[in-house]
């Protein structure tokens, strides 16, 4: 079994760009940014429980990494950069710490490296279980209306929130719930030490209005790019800024 994805081919000899979306997104999420790099072959992946991979369920991050490896092999991707946002960024960090053959580097936008103590994990587990129950039992429009009121999305205006609620409500609540439970931050290990000892290139993107993830970025041994005029979802709020950062990274 492999993950559903959309592949677009560029010039031979350049590494692939493999894009991983955030929670409740899909393979289209990164395409406005990715299509600015037409010289590179691009793979836009649907994570388990999402888009064309909605019917795929996993028990945890190990399963996601295994599916990602098999998907890369199926497309004969031998050299690549991983680019992930939020949940996709966490998947990217987990997978790279576990080892991915052919990895050139990882670029994470607003991805959490992991909670650092049992109290934080217990609190996050309580919170995520409440969201899981809501995704299972309530209309998605109601759930996402509250989801986008969370402090991390404080930079969004009312129109942006309405647009995101409408877009994300096309998902399947049950498969979102299953993926949220399987990949909760509560069950993700703290990756800071592994990321510090890495042998691959590591870049971190965060919006200038995303104070939480700017603080987290400062804890990581990564080259950080702050995206102007953007909050947590920087590639949506300022795609040109993210394109500029990726272009700078890929020139090295």
Swiss-Prot record:
It is an enzyme of class 4 (lyase). GO terms for molecular function: 2-succinyl-6-hydroxy-2,4-cyclohexadiene-1-carboxylate synthase activity. Pathway: Quinol/quinone metabolism; 1,4-dihydroxy-2-naphthoate biosynthesis; 1,4-dihydroxy-2-naphthoate from chorismate: step 3/7; Quinol/quinone metabolism; menaquinone biosynthesis. Catalyzes a proton abstraction reaction that results in 2,5-elimination of pyruvate from 2-succinyl-5-enolpyruvyl-6-hydroxy-3-cyclohexene-1-carboxylate (SEPHCHC) and the formation of 2-succinyl-6-hydroxy-2,4-cyclohexadiene-1-carboxylate (SHCHC). This is 2-succinyl-6-hydroxy-2,4-cyclohexadiene-1-carboxylate synthase. It comes from Escherichia coli (strain ATCC 8739 / DSM 1576 / NBRC 3972 / NCIMB 8545 / WDCM 00012 / Crooks). The lineage of its organism: Bacteria, Pseudomonadati, Pseudomonadota, Gammaproteobacteria, Enterobacterales. Monomer. Its EC number is 4.2.99.20. GO terms for biological process: menaquinone biosynthetic process. Gene3D superfamilies: alpha/beta hydrolase (3.40.50.1820). Belongs to the AB hydrolase superfamily. MenH family.
């Amino acid at each position: 079994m492999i993950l559903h994805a959309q592949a677009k081919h560029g010039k031979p000899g350049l590494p692939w760009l493999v894009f991983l979306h955030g929670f409740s997104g899909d393979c289209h999420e990164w395409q406005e940014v990715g299509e600015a790099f037409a010289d590179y072959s691009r793979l836009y992946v649907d994570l388990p429980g999402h888009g064309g991979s909605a019917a795929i369920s996993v028990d945890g991050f190990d399963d996601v990494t295994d599916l990602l490896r098999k998907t890369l092999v199926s497309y004969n991707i031998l050299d690549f950069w991983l680019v992930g946002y939020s949940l996709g960024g966490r998947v990217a960090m987990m997978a790279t710490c576990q080892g991915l053959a052919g990895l050139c580097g990882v670029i994470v936008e607003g991805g959490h490296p992991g909670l650092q103590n049992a109290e934080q994990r217990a609190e996050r587990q309580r919170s995520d279980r409440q969201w899981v129950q809501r995704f299972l039992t309530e209309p998605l429009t109601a759930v996402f209306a509250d989801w986008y009121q969370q402090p991390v999305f404080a930079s969004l205006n009312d129109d942006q929130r309405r647009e995101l609620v409408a877009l994300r409500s096309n998902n399947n609540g049950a498969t979102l719930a299953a993926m949220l439970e399987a990949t909760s931050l509560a069950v993700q290990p703290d990756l800071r030490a592994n990321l510090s000892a890495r042998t691959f290139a590591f870049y971190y993107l965060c919006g200038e209005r995303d104070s939480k993830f700017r603080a987290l970025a400062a804890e990581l041994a990564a080259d950080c790019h702050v995206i102007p005029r953007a909050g947590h979802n920087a590639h949506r709020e300022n795609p040109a800024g993210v394109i500029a950062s990726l272009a700078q990274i890929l020139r090295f």
